[in-house]
């Protein structure tokens, strides 16, 4: 993916941050609201850029924000909320 949509990235970051705990891939997809092929593109992009970390919870793969992802959340999502007053992410 050459140019990701920053609003979609913000939805990923917001979903993982607001969850407060690691999430399964399916739950992330449902909360972000993308079809599977598009979700996979963004998911892989986020992982490749170090915004997520993978964990294990009772034998299931779960994902949460990495420290870099938390920083990106604070910068991008906060900027969107401040700039687009009241816009739902």
What are these regions (language model features)?
Residues 21-31:
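Short acidic, hydrophobic short linear motifs in intrinsically disordered regions
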Residues 21, 57-59:
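Short strand-connecting beta-turns/loops that link adjacent beta-strands
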Residues 2-3, 33-48:
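Short amphipathic alpha-helical interaction segments
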Residues 47-57:
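A short, conserved structural fragment
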Residues 74-89:
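Amphipathic alpha-helical dimerization/coiled-coil segments
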Residues 13-20, 77:
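Short, locally clustered residues in the helix-turn-helix/winged-helix DNA-binding domain
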Residues 1-13:
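Short alpha-helical segments that sit at the start of domains
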Residues 59-76:
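Basic, amphipathic "hinge/linker" alpha-helix immediately C-terminal to the N-terminal HTH DNA-binding motif
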């Amino acid at each position: 993916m050459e140019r990701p949509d920053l609003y979609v990235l913000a939805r990923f970051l917001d979903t993982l941050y607001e969850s407060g705990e690691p999430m399964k891939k399916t739950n992330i997809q449902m909360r972000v609201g993308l079809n599977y092929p598009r979700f996979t593109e963004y998911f892989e992009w986020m992982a490749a850029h170090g915004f997520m970390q993978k964990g294990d919870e009772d034998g299931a793969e779960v994902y949460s924000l990495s420290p870099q992802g938390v920083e990106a959340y604070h910068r991008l999502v906060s900027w969107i909320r401040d700039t687009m007053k009241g816009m739902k992410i």
